[in-house]
Amino acid sequence: MDENEYLFKNQAGKKYKTIYADPPWITERGGGKIKRGADKHYPLMKTEDIVNLPIDEIADVNCHLYLWVTNKSLPLGLEVMKAWGFEYITAITWVKDRIGLGQYYRGMTEHCLFGRKGMLPYKLIDGKRAQGKTVIIEPKSEHSRKPKAMREMIEKVSYAPRIELFARERFDGWDCWGNEV
């Protein structure tokens, strides 16, 4: 049994209406042998390995997916989303306060792709449809930590039960899977 099968086994039989994932993408880049990006902080995964995660075992037939991508990994994210059985709906862009890595352009944004599988009715708050925004402006903190506003928006717009894949810490009301929790 490989590591992914083992970790997902802990969720056996549980189906989630919301999946939030920040995969450790391997993307080709130029430069030397110095580790400067994600590979300095944690092991990376090939797109094929991300695609092959048994998401269908944990995704409800009606499910929302939030999938983080960098500018470089955007096409890979769309490929993964489709392979996991989700229809792309929109992207939520995080505008950071500091410049990051890049070759031609140095990034100050990341994107969280939003997709759905099946049909979930809109959540209502006081009789009105719960909606989020497609832009988050929040300062960058430590490497790979995502904005707090994203989780708050997910809780507002999408249904429980929820799971975070490749999680760094635990949050009330969420199941977590990852090598940092």
Regions found by a protein language model. Give the residues of each.
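Class I S-adenosyl-L-methionine-dependent methyltransferase catalytic core
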Residues: M1-V181
